[in-house]
Structures are given as structure tokens and as C-alpha cells.
């Protein structure tokens, strides 16, 4: 039976749906959301908690690029001593995948229907797709400086979503970055509230960053790509995933709200 509190959206693209196996027996929908929210807007979380078998789940994102990033970033992730198995379901990817980038992601999907048991090789070594929906860009751009060496575009996007809806983020080798917002007021809020704030990278490095509105001749914009992508994601698709739309994380609206979710902090 499905875990309680799942919000059902319209039927989505299979490229947006991922399988999550090897979950702890006491996992809840809200816990799964906490693991995956940073990759993008979540449309649905379907938690299967069958009697006599280990729980597993299907997570559906709004954007297929977010699903690819979740597979790339969370397959093999250690969650309370359980090594998560994250991959595309067998029916979700394959020869018909978009632009030739989808076939690699579907390799290990056999476990999707079986509750996290067998299955093939898993998504950890799968190449990320190189094609996707057109990038969403905006003129409401800020330049960020003072980023720590391990700061990635996703760290920056997560930090700046405190101000509003981010549609693009990237970082450069010199410790600067650019962030584009959907709305002008969010850009203004970011400059006012996030300038000289403490930034933390995914590796735990911290630094106080400066945020200012990007001018037409900004020295940062258009430089070489992200440190993290160029160094460790050499097989990433040519169009940066960082360009996908991400909804605001604070200032009122929740990330994702299952009807009966029961929050539980994990340390």
C-alpha cells in the first residue's frame, strides 16, 4: 500500500520519475522529500511499504533534468546506515529516451517493481543525458563573489532560493558565480538580504559572500563552467543542468506539502 500523505499531480513524463530502494523500514514520505527536494520541484512521492518486504518509493519531479540529477547525486547515498539505490524505473527510460541521453539511466531499473531487491547495474555509473528542455533564462541576474573553492552551482542555487524562484545558477573558477531569478523583486530581495551572508558548500566549507546586481559588462558572466562540473562531471550533458527552474524554498511557501506528512528530524 502507498505511504500516507502523497499528493497526486497530473500524469507526468516517465523521464521525470525515479525509483528509490533500500530504504529504512521506518521511512516516511517527508523523510524522502528531505533527501530529494534540493534537486528541484517534486510533483509526487509514492511510498510503498508492503508488509513483509522492504519499503521503496517512486519520486516524480517536474523537470526530467532534476530527475537525472537526483539519480546522479543520490544513488549510493548513505541514509541512516542504508545505502540508497536510486535509478530510473525500467519502463521510464530506454531506447526511446530523449536525444540518446536516456538509455544510460535505465540500466538497473529491474528492482523498481520488486521492492528494492534485485535489479541490474544501477544508475550510479550511468552517463547523464545531454539533451533536455530549453534552458530558462532571465534578465534578473546577480553576481556573487567570495565563494569557497568547493562551492558548486547547486550549493549556490540552494542558498539563493531563500530569496525567490531561481531559474539559472552557475559558478566559476575564480570564486564568483551568477544567479538569475524569475522575478525582479526576488533579485532585489537577494541583494538586500543575502549580501554578506554565510554560505556553506556541500563539503562544509563556509565563506561570507557578496551579492550585487549584474551589470552589462560584468567580468564574471560568460566565463568557463562550474568547478564542480568541469572537475568531476566530465560526462555531463552540454547544456548545464543548473539552468533548470527551481521554486523558492522559503519566504512563505513550502517546498512540498504531503497532506498528512509527519516531520521527523534525522541527524
Swiss-Prot record:
InterPro entries linked to this entry: Nucleotide-bd_a/b_plait_sf (IPR012677), RBD_domain_sf (IPR035979), RRM_dom (IPR000504), RRT5_SRSF_SR (IPR050374), SRSF1_RRM1 (IPR034520), SRSF1_RRM2 (IPR029538)
This protein's GO CC annotations: cytoplasm; nuclear speck
Main location: cytoplasm
GO molecular function ontology, one term from the record: RNA binding
PROSITE patterns in the record: RRM
Keywords: Cytoplasm, mRNA processing, mRNA splicing, Nucleus, Repeat, RNA-binding
Subcellular localization: Cytoplasm; Nucleus speckle
Compositional bias annotation for Gly residues: 93-127
GO biological process, one term: mRNA processing
Positions of the UniProt region annotated as Disordered: 90-137, 212-267
Biased composition (Basic residues): 224-267
Chain's role: May play a role in preventing exon skipping, ensuring the accuracy of splicing and regulating alternative splicing.
Entry similarity comment: Belongs to the splicing factor SR family.
Name of this chain's protein: Serine/arginine-rich splicing factor 1
Species of provenance: Xenopus tropicalis
Amino acid at each position: 500500500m502507498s505511504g500516507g500523505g502523497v499528493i497526486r499531480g497530473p500524469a507526468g513524463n516517465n523521464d521525470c520519475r525515479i525509483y528509490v530502494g533500500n530504504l529504512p523500514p521506518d521511512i516516511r514520505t517527508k523523510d524522502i522529500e528531505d533527501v530529494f527536494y534540493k534537486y528541484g520541484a517534486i510533483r509526487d512521492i509514492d511510498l510503498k511499504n508492503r508488509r513483509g518486504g522492504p519499503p521503496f518509493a517512486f519520486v516524480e519531479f517536474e523537470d526530467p533534468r532534476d530527475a537525472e540529477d537526483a539519480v546522479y547525486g543520490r544513488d549510493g547515498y548513505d541514509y541512516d546506515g542504508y545505502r540508497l539505490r536510486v535509478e530510473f524505473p525500467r519502463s521510464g527510460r530506454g531506447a526511446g529516451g530523449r536525444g540518446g541521453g536516456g538509455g544510460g539511466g535505465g540500466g538497473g531499473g529491474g528492482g523498481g517493481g520488486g521492492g528494492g531487491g534485485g535489479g541490474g547495474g544501477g544508475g550510479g555509473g550511468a552517463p547523464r543525458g545531454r539533451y533536455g528542455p530549453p534552458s530558462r533564462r532571465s534578465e534578473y541576474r546577480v553576481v556573487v563573489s567570495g565563494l569557497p573553492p568547493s562551492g558548486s552551482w547547486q550549493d549556490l542555487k540552494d542558498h539563493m532560493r531563500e530569496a525567490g524562484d531561481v531559474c539559472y545558477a552557475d559558478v566559476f573558477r575564480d570564486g564568483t558565480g551568477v544567479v538569475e531569478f524569475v522575478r525582479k523583486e526576488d533579485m532585489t530581495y537577494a541583494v538586500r538580504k543575502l549580501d554578506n551572508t554565510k554560505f556553506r558548500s556541500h563539503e562544509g566549507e563556509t565563506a561570507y559572500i557578496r551579492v550585487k546586481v549584474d551589470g552589462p559588462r560584468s567580468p564574471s558572466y560568460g566565463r568557463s563552467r562550474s568547478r564542480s562540473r568541469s572537475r568531476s562531471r566530465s560526462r555531463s550533458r552540454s547544456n548545464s543542468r543548473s539552468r533548470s527552474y527551481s521554486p523558492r524554498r522559503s519566504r512563505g511557501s513550502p517546498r512540498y506539502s504531503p497532506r498528512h506528512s509527519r516531520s521527523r528530524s534525522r541527524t
